[in-house]
A protein has these predicted regions:
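Substrate-binding pocket helix/loop in short-chain dehydrogenase/reductase
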Residues: 14-16, 23-28, 117
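Residue(s) in the substrate-gating loop at a strand-loop-helix junction
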Residues: 60
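Alpha-helical segment proximal to the catalytic Tyr-Lys
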Residues: 44, 89-90, 159
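Short C-terminal tail/terminal secondary-structure segment
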Residues: 10-13, 158, 162-176
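Short, small/polar-rich loop/turn modules that mediate ligand/substrate recognition or access, typified
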Residues: 92, 97, 161-163
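Active-site loop immediately N-terminal to the catalytic Tyr-X3-Lys motif
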Residues: 16-17, 65-71, 93, 138, ...
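Active-site helix of classical SDR
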Residues: 39, 76, 84
Length: 176
C-alpha cells in the first residue's frame, strides 16, 4: 500500500547546445517514463490498500531552482512533479495520497564520489565540508534524513494530505 518513486539518473553537467538526443531521451526514460509505468502498474494495488494507498515521489531542488548544465535532469524532474500532481488529483477519489519531496544534493549517495565533491567545492571556493553544508541551516542533508521524511509521509501524520511538495534542503536560498 506504499510506493516510493525514486528511479532517477543525474548525468554529468552539459549545456543545452551540447546535449545529445540520446542523452535527453535516456534521462527522460529513467526519470519520467519508468516512474509513469510504476504509477500506472501499481494503481490497482494502491486502490485496493486496506486503509489508503500512499505514494511519495522523489523530485528535486532543480524543480523550483534549476542549475546550468542540468537541462535534461531539471526538465525530467519538473515533468515528474506535474505527473505526480495530476495523479494526486485523479487518484484522490481512490483514497490514494501522492506527495513529493524535493531534496537538494544528498552527498552520501553513489552520485557524489570524493572526486566530484572536491571538484564542486573547489568550483565554489569552499572546502568539501562547507560545500555539504551550503544552506541556510548549515546542515548536511543525508539519505537518512530523506528516508525519515518519506517514512513520515507514508504514516498517519500525512493521512489527510495529497499533492504536497516538501523541500528537504536545509533551506536553499534559491528556493525560499
Amino acid at each position: 500500500d506504499m510506493l516510493v518513486l525514486n528511479a532517477g539518473v543525474f548525468p554529468g553537467g552539459k549545456k543545452i547546445e551540447a546535449l545529445t538526443d540520446e542523452e535527453w531521451h535516456r534521462v527522460m526514460a529513467v526519470n519520467l517514463d519508468s516512474n509513469l509505468t510504476l504509477l500506472r502498474e501499481t494503481h490497482p494495488l494502491l486502490k485496493a490498500a486496506p486503509k489508503y494507498g500512499r505514494v511519495v515521489v522523489i523530485g528535486s531542488k532543480n524543480v523550483p531552482a534549476p542549475g546550468p548544465g542540468a537541462a535534461a535532469y531539471s526538465a525530467s524532474k519538473a515533468a515528474l512533479t506535474q505527473l505526480a500532481r495530476v495523479a494526486a488529483l485523479e487518484w484522490g477519489a481512490d483514497a490514494i495520497r501522492i506527495n513529493l519531496v524535493h531534496p537538494n544534493a544528498v552527498f552520501d549517495t553513489g552520485i557524489w564520489t570524493p572526486e566530484v565533491l572536491a571538484q564542486r567545492a573547489a568550483h565554489y571556493g569552499m572546502t568539501v565540508d562547507d560545500y555539504k553544508r551550503n544552506n541556510v541551516l548549515h546542515e548536511e542533508v543525508t539519505s537518512r534524513d530523506v528516508a525519515e521524511l518519506i517514512a513520515e509521509m507514508c504514516g498517519a501524520l500525512f493521512a489527510k494530505i495529497t499533492g504536497a511538495q516538501i523541500p528537504i534542503d536545509g533551506g536553499n536560498e534559491r528556493v525560499i
